[in-house]
UniProtKB/Swiss-Prot annotation:
This is Quinolinate synthase. Keywords: 4Fe-4S, Cytoplasm, Iron, Iron-sulfur, Metal-binding, Pyridine nucleotide biosynthesis, Transferase. Its main location: cytoplasm. It is found in: Cytoplasm. Iminosuccinate binds at residues 59, 80, 151-153, 168, 238-240, 255. [4Fe-4S] cluster binds at residues 125, 212, 309. One of its GO terms (biological process) is 'de novo' NAD biosynthetic process from L-aspartate. Its EC number is 2.5.1.72. It catalyses: iminosuccinate + dihydroxyacetone phosphate = quinolinate + phosphate + 2 H2O + H(+). The gene is nadA. One of its GO terms (cellular component) is cytosol. Belongs to the quinolinate synthase family. Type 1 subfamily. Binds 1 [4Fe-4S] cluster per subunit. GO terms for molecular function: 4 iron, 4 sulfur cluster binding; metal ion binding; quinolinate synthetase A activity.
Length: 378
């Protein structure tokens, strides 16, 4: 395995007025509304969704009240690709994406004829920030013998430079297939997920050195101590986490796979190493079980995310109502980039169909664990 030497800065705006760093993101997180304000806003949003003939698609990591609203209005709460596919297949001509910018872009790529709105266009992603399209394209040009595989958490421009786009649910299978055909790979942007897949497949992978702000903060030593407090708990880990966290997992998988594991595993307590937003859906899916957040770098004093994405937290009821009322914050993707970016997405979907694999969890926990479980030492 090789890697780039690429420092990643999250605390500065990359382009003033278009994206924001961690500090700017936390400053833009809306205040929690009162119970009365919440009820008023939810009623207003429901009326506006009906008026605009719009559908709300939300990610598992946004706040619970937005997930509830999506469920209550016939929308969707899912991972980023399923959000985009739901929007593509829905009759609504206006999609309101509660998530981060690359999710809105992916929705627009799969639904170029639809209007895609977001509560805050500044809501970005550390993986996206850490992989600027111009730098990544130059890096790919320097290694023309390699197949370019990018994670879903990238901009439309980065996807347009790729041969394949993958999600955490199917990335291992696609890389294994490419490796079996003798292909060498550039992987971007998440170094932890890339390293995990490289170790599982043995593929020759040149890794871009990006990381998810949330998952990168989970700590192996603190997780080991927490496991000692809850000896019967199963540990659920997203593969964007560091290696010493993944090594302690009972199940390693995508957001959907982790929810599925929480339902199907015979345990009452789970330690969860992914964004805290997922706990809402886990508690709904498995109401008799207890979910414990995995430890990050500290107790609010030293962690940048404290297990919740600041850019996801920028989505709120008030700015959701505002975007529906005013029709602003629309996502646009250059048509030429959109056409090119769709090719690696369609290639992944075609691979999944040809191998009779779902991009999300299969529903067969044993099968999913064979791909994304890591019991004991890595």
């Amino acid at each position: 395995m090789q890697s780039t030497i690429k420092p990643v800065e999250y605390d500065r705006p990359i382009a003033a007025g278009t994206v924001c760093g961690v500090g700017q993101a936390w400053a833009k997180v809306p205040d929690a509304p009162s119970a009365e304000e919440r009820a008023t806003l939810k009623a207003r949003i429901k009326a506006l969704l009906a008026r605009e003939k719009a559908v709300l698609v939300a990610h598992y990591y946004v706040d619970a009240e937005l997930q509830e609203l999506a469920d209550e209005t016939g929308g969707c709460v899912a991972d980023s690709l399923e959000m985009a596919r739901f929007g593509r297949d829905h009759d609504a001509q206006t999609l309101v994406v509660a998530g981060v910018r690359f999710m809105g872009e992916t929705a627009k790529i799969l639904s170029p004829g639809k209007r895609v709105l977001m509560p805050d266009l500044d809501a970005t992603c550390s993986l996206d920030l850490g992989c600027p399209a111009d730098e990544f394209s130059a890096f790919c040009d320097a290694h023309p013998d390699r197949t370019v595989v990018v994670y879903a958490n990238t901009s439309a421009a980065v996807k347009a430079r790729a041969d394949w786009m993958v999600t955490s649910s199917i990335g291992l299978e696609i890389v294994a297939d490419l490796h079996a055909r003798g292909e060498k790979i550039i992987w971007a942007p998440d170094r932890h997920l890339g390293s995990y897949i490289q170790k599982k497949t043995g593929a020759d992978m040149l890794l871009w050195q990006g990381s998810c702000l949330v998952h990168d903060e989970f700590k192996g030593i603190e997780l080991d101590l927490l496991r000692a407090e809850y000896p019967g708990a199963k540990v659920l880990v997203h593969p964007e986490s560091p290696e010493n966290v993944v090594a302690q997992a009972d199940v390693v998988g995508s957001t959907t796979q982790l929810i599925d594991a929480a339902v199907k595993l015979d345990a009452t307590h789970f330690i969860v190493a992914t964004d805290l937003g997922i706990l809402h859906k886990m508690q709904l899916a498995a109401p008799g079980k207890t979910f414990i957040a995995a430890p990050t770098a500290g107790n609010s004093a030293t962690c940048k995310s404290c297990a919740h994405c600041p850019w996801m937290a920028m989505n709120g009821l008030a700015n959701l109502a505002d975007v529906l009322e005013r029709g602003h914050n629309e996502i646009f993707v250059d048509p030429a980039i959109g056409v090119r970016a769709r090719l690696p997405i369609d290639r992944m979907l075609d691979f999944a169909a040809a191998h009779k694999k779902r991009v999300q969890a299969s529903g067969d926990l044993q099968r999913d664990q064979q791909l994304f479980a890591n019991v004991g030492a890595a």
